[in-house]
């Protein structure tokens, strides 16, 4: 059981049972490392940074299965180690997509652009992004080893982030107009 990896042998003994009760700190580590990092941010970055492959690994930290991978060598080597020695079935996996973090960067530019122009709208979009993403993680409290990937639960969050990608286009046009390289229509 994945949850036992986070408890280890350090949990508190439950009287009359062989089970260990996790401490509050162990629960927090599980929440941040597994539920937020592995079950939310990994899916988020698959869509906006890139995906290593489509092989499911229920174990967080498996460097060859199901991670996000952007295609920028330095970043990928720091996170996952040298992948050049990986077997061909991993290198040539059809689920492998490298977006070089461009959608992520465009979305962040759109976020800052909206914040500078319309703080109220930005906060609304951020709250919807949060409520359909991280708040769903809190609400669902998914246990490890699900029957299938549950990334569809976070689709709303990805839509709201995509709105910021669209706003980046507006930021780019605004910048070009100010620099007099483009005449506004």
Give the ranges of each region predicted by the language model.
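Membrane-interfacial loop-to-transmembrane alpha-helix junctions, especially the N-terminal start
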Residues: 99, 117-129, 182-184
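Membrane-interface catalytic loops of GT-C/OST-like multi-pass glycosylation enzymes that act
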Residues: 93-96, 118-121, 138-155
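Hydrophobic alpha-helical transmembrane segments of polytopic
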Residues: 106, 125-132, 160
